[in-house]
Amino acid sequence: MKKLTSLRGYLDSKVPFLKDNPENLYLFVENGRIISTLEETPSFEYEYTANIIIEHYSGDQNVLIAVVNDWLRKNQSDISANPTKRQQDFKFEAVILDNTTAHISIELNLTERVLAINKDGKYVIEATPEPVNPFDEWQTTQ
């Protein structure tokens, strides 16, 4: 699943604690579903909860959440755009170990589309990127 690979790389590169302690980051897929229809090709969509576990986190929790939020904006923008999804699709829990350290769990409800394209009687399977965020393309006229 490409989004989990992307998310791990983004967290590793943007969160100082994870740059120094990549072994403390775990990613799990939970409640996975395959959504498909009776279309002519076997295209489908993954729906799953990504569970991000960070053990013994001693960094700034606000930085961690801001980095995840930035990744979501680029890779699953419907969570920020939809009021219902904002309430349900980005959750966290923490076990406070002491005044400076916690185990943190972040849950993200994600989707990934996979297209099956029939070329000369054979299917070519490819993951599709998220649609462009319309607010990133916003232009004003004067």
Protein language model annotation of sequence segments:
Residues M1-D12:
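Polar/acidic, low-complexity leader/linker segments enriched in S/T/G and N/D
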Residues S6, P83-N133:
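Helix-rich interaction surfaces within compact, conserved domain-sized segments
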Residues F17-N51:
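Short, solvent-exposed beta-alpha or beta-beta edge segments that form flexible loop/patches at the rim
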Residues N21-F28, D78-F92:
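Short glycine-rich, low-complexity/disordered patches
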Residues G32-R33, Y57-G59:
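Short, charged/polar surface micro-motifs in flexible loops or helix N-caps
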Residues Y46-H56, L108-L110:
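Oligomerization/assembly interface segments of phage tail-like spikes and tubes
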Residues G59-Q88:
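A broadly used, surface-exposed interaction patch
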Residues S77-S80, E126-Q142:
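Short, cationic low-complexity segments
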